[in-house]
Amino acid sequence: FNVEETQYTKIVLGKVDATDADFGQNANLTYFIQPSSQDLPFEISPWSGVFSVNGELDREKEDKYVLTVVARDNGHEKKLSSSVSVEVLVIDVNDNSPQFFKYDDLIQWTHSETHDLSNNNFNSAMMIPLYKATIQENAPIGTTVTRVYANDSDFIGNGNGLILYSLPQRKNQHTLFSIDSKEGLITTTGRLDYENQ
């Protein structure tokens, strides 16, 4: 079974079905998960074999469950059983934000002109990491200023954990810095003048 990570309340994933060639009680089957554990977010109907998820699935904690489901007949003298492995793959959803690290400080950032930013995926006030760097005003264009670092605990294989960096810029403002979208390396793209800024 494949199922997305989230919180579930008795959602049916499918059915485990077994047959028995005997008759009467000897052919009536009871299903159960072995070993039975209260910690697992799965359950099976003992009579129908309907397999459900009931609880939280978090791919960052557990990406796959392999369970043993037993089908046992209800014979009076001797109960016979058979088992099958059930694999549940937890599919990643984009539920974690990228987190910066190796920064120098945390500051509260408030911007009254949020609507003027061309890349305005920001709240008007937030705590943001601050990277500090110094550079000479006569540094040539293309000089490395600093590097920023971030990670995302989502699965990178489907793109949810892939991080791309960008620098928000004011509309119609001369750009002095750029960032490598993959590496987080910030470089100069214009001439810096200490007297102007």
PLM region spans:
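Extracellular cadherin-type adhesion modules in metazoan precursor proteins
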Residues: 1-197
